[in-house]
């Protein structure tokens, strides 16, 4: 596993939970002897939904809601078998989506 790299992408609606999860992953990887690059903040994805306030007419009266998806990227360079094992056992909050590429 000498020249391999693990790329972890984290997504969440709440940036505080996302940053805590990223810190847990970085701390766990460093403790097991791997070199870590990140967490790198990626652009926040903003989705806006516009709805009419009234049911029948008054099209000028609208309301907008937005959903922000925050993202972070972590690269683990030269992971050891102990690193992979400790990352598999790591417990993260349910609001964080994790994508792992080897």
From Swiss-Prot:
GO process terms (BP): translation
Record bears the keyword Ribosomal protein: yes
UniProt keyword Ribonucleoprotein present: yes
Alphabetically ordered keywords of this record: Ribonucleoprotein, Ribosomal protein
Pfam family, one: Ribosomal_S10
InterPro entries: Ribosomal_uS10, Ribosomal_uS10_CS, Ribosomal_uS10_dom, Ribosomal_uS10_dom_sf
SUPFAM superfamilies for this protein: Ribosomal protein S10
Single GO cellular component term: ribonucleoprotein complex
Gene Ontology MF term list: structural constituent of ribosome; tRNA binding
PANTHER family in the cross-refs: 30S RIBOSOMAL PROTEIN S10 FAMILY MEMBER
Family statement drawn from the similarity comment of this UniProt entry: Belongs to the universal ribosomal protein uS10 family.
Subunit description: Part of the 30S ribosomal subunit.
Summary of the function given for this chain in its UniProt record: Involved in the binding of tRNA to the ribosomes.
Protein name in the entry: Small ribosomal subunit protein uS10
UniProt lineage: Bacteria, Bacillati, Bacillota, Bacilli, Bacillales
Chain's gene name: rpsJ
């Amino acid at each position: 596993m000498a020249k391999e790299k693990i790329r972890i992408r984290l997504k969440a609606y709440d940036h505080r939970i996302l940053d805590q999860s990223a810190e847990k992953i970085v701390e766990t990887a460093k403790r097991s002897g791997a070199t870590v690059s990140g967490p790198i903040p990626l652009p926040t994805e903003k989705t806006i939904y516009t709805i009419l306030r009234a049911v029948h007419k008054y099209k000028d009266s609208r309301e907008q809601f937005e959903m922000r998806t925050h993202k972070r990227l972590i690269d683990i360079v030269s992971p050891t078998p102990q690193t992979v094992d400790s990352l598999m056992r790591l417990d993260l909050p349910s609001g964080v989506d994790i994508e792992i590429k080897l």
